[in-house]
């Protein structure tokens, strides 16, 4: 059974990163000591490390550690062994391109479908659908396919 939270945004006006979601995330990820973070969407072009640090600071407030997938030599094993997964927002074209480039899109879909708790915000939500073709993001890079995870049977536009 899938265990997913699909959020349109990570930050509400006048609040901190993930602040509005933290009560729900503490329940959603209650059995997780460490979350695997996928920072590939890189909002405003920040580095994977900067984005991971930002997300880790938020999760620390609910006593959950976070580690970026880019820190692993084998991202497929990291996904298969993850207690929980969070894909952050940013540019959907960049995110999907990196998921294909790192050959992890199928594994990510499989672990979510098998019940690993998942959080997606913005672009991380868009990829839950069948394709990314509803995104409003600028096409800054051309992914090899517009097909995404298909963990829900429809497409999402996170910022309609």
Where are these regions (language model features)?
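N-terminal beta1-alpha1 cap of cysteine-dependent amidohydrolase-like domains
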Residues: 1-84
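Structural motif
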Residues: 5-6, 86-88, 119-120, 156
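Class I SAM-dependent methyltransferase SAM-binding "motif I" and its flanking Rossmann-like core
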Residues: 97-98, 105-160
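Short amphipathic alpha-helical segments
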Residues: 18-19, 49-50, 97-100, 131-133
């Amino acid at each position: 059974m899938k265990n997913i939270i699909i959020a349109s945004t990570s930050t509400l006006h006048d609040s901190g990163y993930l602040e509005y979601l933290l009560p729900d995330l503490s329940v959603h990820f209650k059995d997780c000591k460490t979350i695997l973070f996928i920072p590939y969407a890189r909002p405003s072009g920040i580095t994977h490390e900067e984005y991971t640090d930002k997300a880790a600071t938020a999760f620390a407030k609910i006593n959950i550690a976070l580690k970026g997938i880019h820190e692993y030599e084998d991202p497929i094993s990291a996904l298969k062994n993850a207690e929980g997964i969070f894909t952050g927002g940013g540019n959907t074209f960049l995110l999907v391109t990196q998921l294909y480039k790192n050959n992890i899109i199928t594994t990510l879909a499989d672990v979510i479908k098998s019940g690993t708790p998942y959080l997606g915000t913005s672009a991380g939500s868009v990829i839950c659908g069948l394709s990314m073709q509803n995104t409003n993001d600028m096409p800054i890079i051309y992914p090899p396919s517009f097909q995404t995870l298909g963990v829900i049977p429809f497409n999402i536009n996170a910022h309609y």
